[in-house]
Amino acid sequence: MSISLRCAAALLLTGILLNGCGNSEGSADIRVLNVSIDYSTVDLYLDNGTTNTPTITGTTYGTLTPYKGVSGGAYTVEFTNNGVQSSLKSLSENLAARTSKTYVSYGDIGGFGFLEILENQDPPDSGYTMVQIIDAAPDAGSVDVYLTDPAATLADSSPTFSGVAGGVVGSGFLTITDGTYRLRVTGAGNQSDIRLDSVTGTSFSNQEILSIVLGGTRGGVLVNATVIPQQGTATPITNPYARVRAVAGIPSGSNLSASLSGSTLLTSAAANTVSSYSLVQAGTAQLNLTLNNGALTPTSQTLNPGWDYTILVLNGSSVAGTTTTLLADDNRLPTSSTYAKISLVNAMSSLGDPVTLNVNYTPEANAVALGNSSATSQVTAGTADTEIDTVDATTSTTLFSNIQATLTGNGVYDLFMFGSAAAPVAALHINRQQ
């Protein structure tokens, strides 16, 4: 058996359209695939030095447009937000007549980019397929890509593409036997760090030339994929999983167990415990909790594919009974390695007041209510020289202060505040570091 993919798993990158095959006599044919979550609708302009023309407009997230034929020549290719003329990013290049290209737009706010796929490759010999990886998911960090027999285990497999970096067309084409392949993506060098699994496999046809585009997700760690045959119709592979962890905001001396759709998150965990993330099937999931050896009524949680979540369980003097809150986590990386990201989670179940987070005397999260988390803030990274303080937003009382905290570059952190005003507990938790 060999290596391939195309009709894979679930489709969340909805609306991937058909695209007529190129190309018109004397023209260059271009199209756009948009995999940017933050820039969910984009326009492509072509500037020939005389006029700046909106050429492909209104490309929504997950959509591959039909080809647009343009006169061959030198252009500035420019992307903008839909309906806005200010440039997100531009590139000067020559669009040669009788050639075809797909532009892939991607990125977060402040980190927009686009890559291009050249679609005039000669086909491989009969019985083979050519495959390349286009990594438009820089937030995922460096990844390994496996194309295997659908039944093969990762432990018995080697990466087809190793250490693929985000934001580059870096893999080059690999010629493989045609057939059905299971696509799996892991963190580089770590087979247990699953980022995508197409499970059943995708068919790679005889003499096909395929580009597999990896796209980012809302959580930042998992990825989606889109398989694009040269000058053909795209097939999306939507991640079937979410990543979920649980947090025990319970009184000292208590213990909590938590499972979600059969995945164990906590086992007799002490107060103030933060579990690791686990992969859980997206959709409706049943949450089962046991507090101090007593089972609580199960609840249903709705998980979006590709998202990261925290299930915050609270029990204490400021809470009526036991509450659970599903918090969406933003674990996308900072814009550069000189920065870190941080958010505040208010789990002070025996206080009840909102809490404010200051980093180097600057408020980064204001009056976060009990049972909630703040938006993620980007701050300057530092080693043993960052001051982090939390304050009771009602009384202005300092709850926690660390004048020698370390926030590592490219790290994503949560500061969990537990306990009461008399006995506050702070836990600075690193969610990921690239």
Predicted regions and their residues:
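Intrinsically disordered, low-complexity polar regions and short flexible loop motifs
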Residues: 21-434
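Sec-dependent bacterial lipoprotein signal peptides
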Residues: 1-19
